Amino acid sequence: MIIDLPSTTTSKVNKKLVELRETGGAVALGRVLTLAIITDDGAQAEEAIAAANEASREHPCRVVLIAKGARRAAARLDAQIRIGGDAGASEVIMLRLYGPLADEGASCLVPLLLPDAPVVAWWPYETPKVPAEDPIGRLAHRRITDAKSERNPVKALEHRAAVYADGDTDLAWTRLTSWRALLATALDLPPHEKVESATVTGRADSPSTTLLAAWLASALGVPVTRVRAQDGQGIVSVVLQRRSGQIVLERPNGQFATLTQPGQPDRRLTLHRRSIRDCLIEELRRLDPDEIYSQTLQALPKVEGGSAGASTSRRGTGSRTRTKTATAGKSAGRAGGKTTARTAAAAPAATSPVAGTGTTRSRRTAEPKPSRRGSTAAARSRSRAKNGEDTAGEQG
């Protein structure tokens, strides 16, 4: 049931709620909290109400949506009450504020609060600079924001850390619950070795990727690198480096993940991207300060930025390791060749030169012997037979 109350007051809205309770049997005695949603009028308001209705099936509450309308219009309050099937397990009160009233959301909210019930404020889109100092934020026990909706999500997280107050939380943090649980479970399995470093890969505009990297830096106390991914959605992969090998949790498609651990078969896991409904339900379960979230925000400066497009999957890391090994081998070979040349220069002239070093040969031997090519060819054959041993060392 939807009841429209155009050009009304909060007093008339309260009277209408009492009337509906008496005639229709809609009661507010079972409501556990008041959820205040602050957003602009339009499609965004309906999306927020839909998510709140779904969340109310687990947390019956009174939803008061404060929709800010045109500020140049005349001062006016339009209200709408939704109960029954249109409100899930809650009762929804939508307040559309126009003109000067658009900035008086707290004054309109107070008369509609449930008595002796906690208040949760949710800004699904535009967020005040300091939520705890906002007029509605002062009324709330919990203040929910969403850095994902900001123009610069990562910078928004840094601002959240600077103005954090007990009761603040962000849905970018709530989206990490499944990732944190899987990583913690993987570390609980043997071998119980210390993590040496970690790498988190995700899209550049993913605040959850940055928060996950900060959480690992805070919880493990190890260097953590945040790498930007060109493909994928949100968080793509996490690599934990230990002495025995890597723990890799990779989700390339945003739905299913693969957990790889040394000495164990790969495991395919369901790791869907969490909806607003799921995140809101989780946040409404607790009204106390989130200390882990606070510590994670303070650990943001510890995260090292990564190069764009780099990959942290197990295969990618292995290829980089092989490349580094090959490069080191070439460098060692060159160094060995130079040492052999210097040693041969100090030796008698009869000592055979290193294959392919014509300059060294001319310095060591003024008059080359006729059999030099044969000796060099034989040295090359012996070098191949011994799988890459140094020719000069073999002849010496």
Tell where the protein language model's regions lie, with residue ranges.
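A generic structural motif
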Residues: 63-71, 122-124, 147-148, 223-234
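Intrinsically disordered, polybasic Lys/Arg-rich low-complexity tracts
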Residues: 312-396
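Short N-terminal or domain-adjacent regulatory/targeting segments
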Residues: 1-30, 170-188, 285-311
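Internal, hydrophobic cores of structured domains that mediate oligomerization or house catalytic pockets
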Residues: 95-184
